[in-house]
Amino acid sequence: MLADYHVHSEFSDDSVFPVNDVCALAIVRGIDEICFTDHVDFEIRPDWDEYRADPSCAPIIEGQPSINVDYERYFPTIAEARDRFAGELTVKTGMEFGVQSHTIGRFDELFERFAGEWDFTILSIHQVGNQEFWNGTFQQGRTQDEYNMGYYEEMLRVAQRFDHWSVLGHLDLIKRYDQAGPWPDANARDIVAEILEEAIRRGKGIELNTSSIRYGLTDLTPSTELLRLYRDLGGRILTIGSDSHKPEHLGAHIPMMRERLKDIGFTEFCTFQDMEPMFHKL
């Protein structure tokens, strides 16, 4: 079984890939199941009702307004795709929640507002204190130790206080935006172990994000060392996702990454249904 559990579409501000086109291409590529995981990052992007009331509230990125998922269109569109491609492709409904400790309440409200719609959610830390990693705002004025530890400290806070998530997304994402060079996993081993123990205790998991290859990273995301730590702590829930935003990303490198997971000692991966993990042999 081939599944891609980190897929963006036209409903993410950084993708223009139509839902039906994603599904059609997945079938061509021999993918059995996908889960749409479009972006929501409260206080970074406005919701569509906020944007319609005041277009100036949306930041402009690469010439386009940056807005959260259009919820009222998102869920019906995915449901229609699920019916349209039934028998050829299993289509699941998810989102990638870019949570910060001070926005947990808004994500609780969003999840409860659409109760019954969710198969899967990714908990990602994309910002701390509304400061972004991708543009270096969070790193500015901090030492390499400070911004790396600050990232993991925020992840721990959120993982402890927020419950509506399935897996931790790209666990060591901060590496992608670290211009100071390699920072040893050993420096964060204790706090990452605490994060992973919290996930395991809550019945949550982590993802292997295959975008490490297209970003030119020298290791997996999360790293081989952190994946081994998760395994050694007893972690079993593990999804694999391409973090696709464009056609060329969809399903990329997943078969190879499954072999890497076997080498590390994993024997299973997960898909999700109604927020519950389903285990499959690697």
Predicted regions: what they are:
Residues 1-101, 177, 182-186, 210, ...:
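An N-terminally biased module of ancient metal coordination in phosphate/nucleic-acid-related enzymes
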Residues 1-9, 19-24, 129, 159-160, ...:
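Charged catalytic cores and adjacent phosphate/nucleic-acid-binding surfaces used
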Residues 34, 91-93, 121, 206, ...:
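Hydrophobic/aromatic residues located in beta-strands of well-ordered beta-sheets
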Residues 38-39, 125, 172, 273:
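Residues that line or immediately flank small-molecule/substrate-binding pockets and catalytic motifs
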Residues 48-202:
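Extended substrate/RNA-proximal surfaces in nucleic-acid metabolism proteins
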